[in-house]
Amino acid sequence: MLSVILKESVRNLGKAGMVLKVKPGYARYLLTQKKAVRATKENLKSLEEQYLFIEKENLEKLEAAKVLKASLEDEFLIITRQAADDGKLFGSVTPKCISKLLSDKGYNIHYRNIFFYSVIKYIGEYVVNLELHPDLVLPITLYVVKNDLGAMQAQKLHAEKKRKIEEGKVEKGSCTEGESLELGSVDNDINSGNVDSNESEKQDSVSE
């Protein structure tokens, strides 16, 4: 175990300024992402002074996260996966998959800052949560489809939902997790391909 001082609050770990012992692999992640510094004698001695700097840096990161949030708010993701006739996926969708999709769009978000409220097991519509900052989490829509035709229909579905949101007919983020395949013929068509967290985090940790 390695001792570190958190430079910012980290979900499920601790608040900025805390001195914690973490596993070497996780310590490397925290240090590389500049979320922590080593808890050396010098750093511990100047912790109070460091804390003032940490607070200032944390506020700057929060402002940067707000800018990123503004650019991401209209984004949605589509991922293609093989599935059985009932829509059950043969593979899996993990935070690393989402991180790659976002990277392809020009957004650098580490997979550890991506989480789901439920495991993605079926074709359909889901909500993915992006932790842009410990105090700022942005939910975005993910469509899991079987083929290009399904991707086209997902784009059409999202455009229709956006129109209804703008007209005030539905609330933003109104997708119910795990029920997207039961919303009607459009999602059923995505499931069939005729038209157009958690367990996932455990899978990612094993693959490291």
From Swiss-Prot:
Q: Where is the composition biased (Polar residues)?
A: 188-197
Residues spanning the membrane: none
Query: What keywords is this UniProt entry annotated with?
Result: Ribonucleoprotein, Ribosomal protein, RNA-binding, rRNA-binding
Q: Where is the composition biased (Basic and acidic residues)?
A: 199-208
Say yes or no: keyword Phosphoprotein present. no
> Which residues lie within the region annotated Disordered?
168-208
Which GO molecular function, any one, fits this protein according to its record? rRNA binding
One GO BP annotation is:
translation
Q: Does the keyword RNA-binding apply?
A: yes
Q: What does this protein do?
A: Binds to the 23S rRNA.
Q: Which family does it belong to?
A: Belongs to the bacterial ribosomal protein bL9 family.
The record's section on NCBIfam families has: L9 (TIGR00158)
Name of the protein this chain belongs to: Large ribosomal subunit protein bL9
The organism named in the record is: Ehrlichia chaffeensis (strain ATCC CRL-10679 / Arkansas)
Q: Give the gene name.
A: rplI
